[in-house]
Amino acid sequence: RIVNFANELIGKYPHEKIIVSQTDYERNPFYGLNQLPSFISPFSDEFLFEIKFLKTYLNEYLKTSLQLDPRKDNWIYDGLQVYAMMKYMDENHPNTKMMGSVSNLRLLKSYNIANIGFNDQYSYFYMLMARKNLDQALGDPKNTLIKFNEQIASKYRSGLSIRFLDDYLQNDAVPASIKQFYNQNQIKQVSRTDFETILKSNTDKDINWFFNTIINSRAIIDYKFSSVKKTKDSITFSVINKTETPIPIPVYGTKKGAVVFKQWLDIEECDSTFTFPRNGADKIILNLKNEVPEYNLRNNWKKLDGFFPNNRPVKFVFLKDLEDPYYNQVLYVPSIYYNLYDGITPGIRLHNKTILDKPFTFDINPSYSTKSNNLSGLVSFAVNQNYRNSTLYNVKYSVSSSYFHYAQDASYLRINPMVQLRIREPNFRDNRKQLILLRQVIVNKEKSAF
């Protein structure tokens, strides 16, 4: 099935034999599957073998038959491999979750990490680096990429980007272009320029943005609604391009979760006002199915029902979870501390630190001092600001505070404002980094008779 799938999607393999070995897989594993301990088996042995074989076969298939510069055009190898893997999963395992059978546990039903689809994980791995401001342009030479980007983040975003272009162009323009590109490769050595030329010849749409922005730059994508007005029959809304990255974006209308309309907003239309038939929609959403590898999905929703619609309701989650753009997640964890003057201090920690970094985080931990019979605890707030095109790549502003007792009849309040400036070398592979830390510690102590 995998052999036939690759031949139909990409083109007939030109050699008589292809070797697919365990050693090849171990050199280039499927990250996520290979991180699971042996005693956890969320997937059947048959499925694991199928996915491992699919990844390794596609890798060997492309590397031994596609004549590309492995440094300059490595993103094409990666993009075609991941795009093919996602397409294979859509066709053969459309309902498989990222967590496999673990997703069926009732205890985990409320967790986003247990509910996202198998193909959704690619976007999260890319976001892991983008939110840390460590992502790199897909078109950068392979020897300039940091290891995580080379093996995971850039590889996955390459596949997501080709899938995005496929969804935007429609009419099988991308699959047809892949076949033409592969066939042309049998005649001569091909390059990114040939791939670009073939893609442009198969569509009437302007796709210069795909190569100029998606492939050749680190530009991030973030759209949001600025205003929404509704009537019984129509919706009028404005869209803001927050990062000024000229990329088309799809808008959806949904009714009770079912899609009632979808429309692509082209580059020249963004930062504009649109009016669409409502078709009974109770919500409009940008990039609903994450076709566009967007930096921030949390501001893509607008409810149309209710006098004061709550676009993202609060959701309480125990311990930890993956970021869920549908909700304002508050994670809670029971806590317990001890010191001589407060005694045992049970409490509860409330925070919003999901697996992906966020621009604003809070961490509140109220507790009860059993010895002094008073409230105590800790609290912190932080604002994280990334600078995309500077050696000063991150500034973090934070303030934290704690309140406890230092004597049996006296407490202290500590307030700690802080600014951290992180500086890196222009070469991302250079591990040298500098940290400038500005901090003030303010302590207010009650007087003690002891």
Where are these regions (language model features)?
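Residue-level detector of the transmembrane beta-barrel scaffold of outer-membrane proteins
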Residues: 175-177, 210, 331-333, 347, ...
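Amphipathic alpha-helical substructures
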Residues: 14-15, 142-143, 147-231
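Juxtacatalytic substrate-recognition/specificity segment
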Residues: 1-76, 80-88, 92, 146, ...
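Active-site-adjacent bridging/hinge elements
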Residues: 28-32, 51-61, 127-142, 324-326
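Acidic/His/Gly-enriched intrinsically disordered linker/tail segments
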Residues: 72, 76-160
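Beta-strand-rich binding/interaction modules
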Residues: 17-18, 174, 207-208, 221-288
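Outer-membrane beta-barrel translocator/channel fold
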Residues: 367-450
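Outer-membrane beta-barrel initiation region
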Residues: 265, 275-276, 287-391, 429-432, ...
